[in-house]
Amino acid sequence: MKIGLFIGALATKMNLHDQIKMIIDAEKRGFDSFWFAQTGETDVLTTIALAGKETENIELATGVIPTYTRHPHVLAQQAATVNAAISNRLILGIGPSHRPGVERLGLKYDRPALYIREYVEILRELTTQGHTNYQGDIFNIESSFNLIDSTPMPIMISALAPMMLKVAGEVADGTITWMAGLTALRRHVIPKLNAASASAQRGQLRVVAGVPFSVTDDIRNTKIVAGEKFQVYGRLENYRRILDYGEVEGPSDVAMLGNEVQLAEQIAQYFDAGVTDLILAPFASDIQDESNLSNLDTLQGIAAEYNV
């Protein structure tokens, strides 16, 4: 049971230097991991490589890198290089992203579950052996590179739908979710992931749950703020589906809100449900205020009970 921080769900409005300072601060505060979503800002693997030189123990993770714009050979080589640079602390989270964004780039969003299955299998061979001769339905690849100082890294996928959870259970090291609340995790995500893992005769996998988080004594108004800040996720097909699985109206219903005692109780419920890693995206309770200092102070105290 681990607690980490997650940025990228909202525009960070931070330059590269400030992002690295935030990661250094996260390690000093005792957070177990720091997760980046690849958005329209800095390249996350480059940021991780830079942050890794300033930190020692914190896991640094991508949550997630869209794959349709990256050939698996290119991503495998880059990830192995970054992993070596940060003393093998990288968690490589990948996902197909969303149809509208992929098609805006002139690419086909085709058979995403099969595509990700083959992509993970290729990544696994390249990052563990340094070579592959892969013949699949989508990819036909013969490639190699020298693995220098890099050990095999966990490969996670952003699995929310049933077919993707099957892929995650059979070939990946687990799933990374966003906007999956307790009900969706208990009834849908974790049972399907575990069933797929068991059928493939694999052990327990990581369930990484990303959740918006805010310390507040005014839950009603903070929920309104959450609804405004995260409203886009209620419109994207993949997230809308997981919200429906959780029987909630919108993203604000998933946000973790309250004082320290209330938040500690909510966090415990996620771990009781079978989540292995809880990655929290702090947001300010005031729509005009981007300060997350009180969030981090409170979360640091709660995380100390788990990250030992």
Per-segment meaning from a language model:
Residues 1-308:
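Active-site-adjacent structural elements that line small-molecule/cofactor binding pockets in enzymes
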